[in-house]
Amino acid sequence: MKKGILIALCSLAVLFVACKKPVEPTSDPVDYTPTYVGNYLGQFDFNITSVNNQAQTLAFTIDNIGMDIAKGTAFNAITATVTVDNETRQTSGTATAEKADFESVNLIIDKPDQNYYFELNLKMEGTKAENDTTLNIVGTFSGSGNATILTPQGVFEQPFDEVSGTLSGNLVKQ
């Protein structure tokens, strides 16, 4: 009986090996980084939705935001240098056919001429417009800061211990 079981197991093993086909890749992997590489310039619209854990509706726009995107060292990896005025920060991310997904980046937005200062953590993703020269950015932000606000009662400075919201922007390839 042991001999019969051994023959049956060997037959099954031979049948399994003979029927197993190697898996062929469907296509070569595509590197999407060239789609996004370039130097972009534009503006971000920030929509504040929460201040100090209270629902708020405030908005501001930052002009002259630069984003220089380069190919990273890994497959489909990108690096980005984000510049607002003289503040420059680096982040990295990945590029797919659908979007560029960036790691969080901390950015200081200091606009004394517009009476506000924010230290924000941005989480962004970008998609290319049909014209292939515009990078559409969407994301979220959180952080702190302060702003001088004009009210019917006068001018006062409002500290933002916790601020969060959404951002969007259009950056044009230079």
Question: PLM features: residue spans?
Answer:
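Bacterial Sec-dependent N-terminal signal peptides
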Residues: 4-8, 12-43, 168-174
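A short hydrophobic beta-strand element
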Residues: 40, 76-78, 131-143
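Generic short beta-strand segments
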Residues: 41-49, 103-110, 138-150
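Predominantly extracellular/secreted and cell-surface proteins with exposed
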Residues: 50, 58-133
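Surface-exposed ligand/attachment interfaces on beta-rich extracellular proteins
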Residues: 53
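Edge beta-strand at a domain terminus
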Residues: 138-174
